Amino acid sequence: MQIFVKTLTGKTITLEVESSDTIDNVKSKIQDKEGIPPDQQRLIFAGKQLEDGRTLSDYNIQKESTLHLVLRLRGGGKKRKKKTYTTPKKIKHKHKKVELAVLKYYKVEDDGSVKRLRRECPNCGASTFMANHKDRLYCGRCHLTLKLEA
């Protein structure tokens, strides 16, 4: 039977084969016609690469079927060297959580009442304390400044 082999250049070769021929035999016939060594040849039929030990009938290759010839690529990408850094890595800052930090904003009086040690901002509302400076109180969020009477 006759099959066609289409090369990378677009040239079509006709080969006379039998359905019992192996893929190795087909590759050697291509070598006789084109001069490409069989170890560099890859034959593709119906989107599948043909393995050397199997026959044409295994892949259901019939008369006047077209095989595509592509060349095997040698090697792969170049291996990259791992970078070595001369300076040691910077140690990340670890957040230290103080368990009872809230207690420094309040004071419990002798009679049991709770007094705020820092003043809250009247604009921003609760939980935004104002910074104590020697002559003023300052809110870092809304930039409100209150002068203290001496």
UniProtKB/Swiss-Prot annotation:
Protein family according to the UniProt entry: In the N-terminal section; belongs to the ubiquitin family.
Zn finger (C4-type) location: 121-142
Keyword vocabulary terms for this entry: Cytoplasm, Isopeptide bond, Metal-binding, Nucleus, Ribonucleoprotein, Ribosomal protein, Ubl conjugation, Zinc, Zinc-finger
GO molecular-function terms, A-Z: protein tag activity; structural constituent of ribosome; ubiquitin protein ligase binding; zinc ion binding
Family annotation (Pfam families): Ribosomal_S27 (PF01599), ubiquitin (PF00240)
Organism: Schizosaccharomyces pombe (strain 972 / ATCC 24843) (Fission yeast)
Position of the Glycyl lysine isopeptide (Gly-Lys) (interchain with K-? in acceptor proteins) cross-link: 76
Disulfide bonds, paired cysteine numbers: none
Keyword Cytoplasm: yes
Further comment found in the protein's record: Ubiquitin is encoded by 5 different genes. Ubi1 and ubi2 are synthesized as a polyprotein with one copy of ubiquitin fused to ribosomal proteins eL40A and eL40B, respectively. Ubi3 and ubi5 are polyproteins with one copy of ubiquitin fused to ribosomal proteins eS31A and eS31B, respectively. Ubi4 is a polyprotein containing 5 exact head to tail repeats of ubiquitin. There are 2 genes for eS31 in S.pombe.
Protein name, UniProt field: Ubiquitin-ribosomal protein eS31B fusion protein
